[in-house]
Amino acid sequence: MRRGSAEMRAEMNRIFWAADSTVQTNDYTTYPQTGIGQVFPLFVKPEYQVCNHAKNGRSTKSFMDEGRLKAIEEKIGAGDFLFIQFGHNDEKKEDPTRYTEPFSTYMENLETFIRVAKDHSAYPVLITPLERRCFMDEKHLGIGAHSDYVAAMKQTAEKNNVPLVDLY
C-alpha cells in the first residue's frame, strides 16, 4: 500500500492548498490580514478536511525548493484535492529564489504540482492569482499585474485537462 492511499487514512477526503500569502492561515496578530485558506473550512462540507500548506512569499519555485510540495506528496491520496494558486511571487524578477518565466518555468512548475496530485489519484485544481491592490490613483485600481501568469496558468489547465478557477 502506498503512502497517502485512501486505505491508509481516515475516510475523510482532504483539500490541500499549495499557495502564497493570499491563502495562508495567519496568526491573530496580523488581523485583518486573512488568507482564503484560513476561512475556507467554513465553506466546505464537514466530511472534508482542509490542509493549508500556503506560505507567505512563496512562488511555485520556492514552494518546491523548500520541500513544501514534498510534504503534500507524502500525505495526499486518492480522492483528495490539490488547490494550486501561485503567481504573485513568481513574477518577482529581482529575486532568483522565487522568479519564474510565465510561459516556461512557471508552466513547468505548475505541471509538477499537477503530476503530484494525479500520481496519487488526487484531483488538481488550478486557481489564478488575485489581482494586486495597485492603484493608478486614489479611486482606480490598476489591472493586469499578473496577466502573463494568468494566461500561462489557463494554458496549463487546458493542456493538462484540469479545472481552473479564475479569480483574476
Regions found by a protein language model. Name each.
Residues 9, 58-59, 166:
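Short, solvent-exposed coil/turn linker segments
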Residues 25-29, 57-61, 138-140:
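Short linear motifs at secondary-structure transitions and domain/linker junctions
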Residues 67-168:
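Alpha-helical cap/lid subdomain in secreted, periplasmic
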Residues 15-17, 21-23, 44-46, 53-59, ...:
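Cell-envelope and extracellular/periplasmic
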Residues 1-55, 70-78:
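Serine-esterase "nucleophile elbow" of acetyl-processing enzymes
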Residues 5, 21, 59-62, 104, ...:
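Generic serine detector
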